Regions:
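Sec-dependent bacterial lipoprotein signal peptides
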Residues: 1-19
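A generic structural signal for nonpolar/aromatic side chains embedded in well-ordered alpha-helices
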Residues: 21, 49, 225-229, 409, ...
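Membrane-proximal, proline-rich intrinsically disordered regions
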Residues: 21-79, 83-84, 91-94, 102, ...
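Extracellular glycan-recognition regions
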Residues: 24, 86, 482-484
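Beta-strand acidic-aromatic groove motif in beta-rich domains, primarily in extracellular
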Residues: 58-66, 136-139, 403, 472-475
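Structured, solvent-exposed acidic/aromatic patches
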Residues: 69-123, 127-421, 448-453, 533
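C-terminal functional modules
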Residues: 386, 394, 411-534
Length: 534
């Protein structure tokens, strides 16, 4: 990974050049920000796509952090998933799509750009699958071709998934046949073997994601398709993890969003009590990642302010305060803003590049032992891939051992988190603590009766390992309904959980082919019944 100031300075200049005029309605009309093959430098353009990729993925993750209880949701689902929530993300995606098509056009005439275009197609494919997973049908083939399609129509998620799968296969071939590298590859430093491992793992993710509707995307035997992938290179070690690494640069702003939220100014959010409880108290041993994930700013009692002053006596509040100065809020708690910003628990060392918790009890902006925001965006790690393989082994009988994969998935997560930032502290977790944690999980796994109960354990551990990438949890929750003990909003026992996100209100206003959708609409691979999750 590269974190150089020179790169971010270059990105700033590119961004100014590309985005100097107001960005608007990328899927709909001619836009002076769009580059054409005649005006584009492929190196700079692929740099820009990498920047757009991490920015858009980071924003999408923020959109589901509170939905999935990592942060506390202090609104209703309807307020949280409103028609304006994806305005910025929608525009960013279609700018990236236009840049992607420009690189593709350049590569058709220049064989030295095979590797460039392969990276381009994989990054754009990942963004596209994310957009489909959040919204279902989106403009795709007709998008960013305003001369032919001034009001591009929707394309089904099924058709888009099929096209992305084809793009992955083509990208792998192009990587294998390419002879020229990309000079500023921010993910794998032009390591072609790692890009191929990512491409295969991305395909695995798609197959597991669609296991309830695999025939819709033309996969008649999903277990066979997955087994064929298992014979190929996959992400199976931390050195192959697909992640974006942030820097410590402030101008232009290049630090992790979690760090900017918790350490640059007073923390305006609350961590979710359910998530903190799961780390601290859901097993007989605390999660060894606890002090790496979370940082406590204060050792003061919370009971002098609302809601803590009353919520212990309120039957609808599940947690209120979990103790040991882990101060957060329950899911759906709307009583906020009582001046305790510097007493709340905030993001810690991993993944946002904050502070490791050594009982300092100092407000986050005043700490000096943090990583200055040089965190990571964990997108598809060896841990995630092994959780997906464990699910496939259990539910699709792929032939692998789900217990073994569960152990390896948790171990990979522990190794990654506990080595992050090279902590040297009396409070750092030990190998013995990790072993005790994993042993308890596997004991529970082997002492439940049904595969559904085993899947609940796999997905719950996936949920805990996916801190920093709530998209994985959001998808798994809709696909499986797990974790089964996830907290329901305290003010509503029967809420309408957003099974998808609405379209950008701005896009619907301008594009006559779009009609606003409901957040109860299910994406094609979510075949579970209405009211399945809360």
């Amino acid at each position: 990974m590269r974190r150089t100031i020179e790169y971010f300075g270059r990105i700033a200049l590119i961004s100014i050049a590309l985005l100097g005029c107001e960005v608007s309605d990328f899927d709909l009309q001619d836009n002076p920000n769009f580059l054409t093959p005649k005006s584009a430098d492929p190196e700079y353009l692929l740099n820009e796509i990498q920047y757009q990729f991490q920015s858009l993925m980071g924003l999408m993750i923020l959109n589901t952090d509170d939905l999935m209880r990592y942060e506390a949701m202090t609104d209703t689902y309807g307020d949280l998933v409103s028609v304006t929530v994806l305005d910025t993300e929608w525009e960013s995606y279609f700018e990236a799509l236009n840049n992607s098509k420009t690189i593709e056009a350049l590569a058709e005439k220049d064989e030295t750009l095979l590797f460039h275009n392969a990276i381009n197609k994989l990054l754009l494919g990942y963004l596209t699958i994310t957009m489909v997973d959040y919204m279902g049908a989106i403009p795709y083939t007709e998008a960013v071709v305003p001369s032919e399609y001034p009001n591009p129509g929707l394309e089904s998620g099924i058709d888009i998934y099929k096209k992305v799968l084809n793009d992955i296969d083509r990208a792998i071939l192009d990587i294998e046949n390419s002879t020229f590298n990309f000079s500023t590859d921010l993910f794998y430093d032009s390591d072609k073997d790692k890009w191929i491992a990512f491409a295969n793992s991305f395909k695995l993710k798609i197959l597991v994601q669609t296991r309830l509707a695999s025939s819709e995307i033309g996969v008649s035997d999903i277990a066979l398709a997955i087994n064929e992938l298992l014979e190929k290179d996959l992400i199976d070690s931390e050195t192959e993890d697909f992640q974006y690494t942030f820097s410590t640069v402030e101008e232009p702003e290049s630090r992790h969003r979690y760090f900017r939220r918790g350490y640059v100014s007073n923390f305006g959010q609350y961590m979710g009590n359910y998530f903190m409880f799961m780390l601290k108290d859901s097993k007989s041993v605390a999660d060894p990642r606890l002090r790496y994930y979370l940082y406590r700013q204060s050792d003061s009692s919370p009971f002098s302010i609302v809601p803590y002053s009353t919520c212990l006596q309120e039957s609808n509040v599940d947690y209120c305060y979990i103790g040991d100065f882990y101060r957060g809020l329950d899911h759906g708690e709307s009583r906020t803003g009582f001046g305790d910003n510097e007493e709340r628990t905030v993001y810690g060392l991993y993944p946002g590049g904050g502070t490791f918790d050594e009982d300092q009890f100092v407000s986050a902006p005043k700490t000096s032992t943090h990583l200055d925001g040089a965190g990571i965006l964990p997108l598809l790690t060896s841990s995630f891939v092994k959780f997906l393989r464990a699910e496939a082994a259990l539910m699709l009988s792929t032939g692998e051992d789900p217990e073994k994969l569960l152990r390896e998935a948790i171990q990979d997560s522990m190794d990654k988190v506990l080595s992050f930032g090279e902590v040297d502290s009396d409070f750092e977790s030990t190998d013995e603590e990790v072993e005790a944690y994993i042993d308890e999980v596997l004991f529970n796994f082997n002492n439940v009766a049904t595969n559904e109960q085993k899947l609940d354990i796999i997905i719950t551990e996936y949920y805990l390992a996916a801190f920093g990438n709530s998209m994985e949890s959001y998808n798994a929750y809709r696909r499986t309904g797990y974790p089964s003990n996830i907290q329901v909003p305290i003010d509503n026992d029967n809420p309408t959980f957003p099974r998808s996100f609405p379209y950008s209100a701005r896009a619907v206003e301008i594009n006559s082919s779009l009609t606003q959708k409901l957040n109860t609409d299910r994406v094609f691979w979510d075949t579970n019944p209405e009211g399945f999750i809360k």
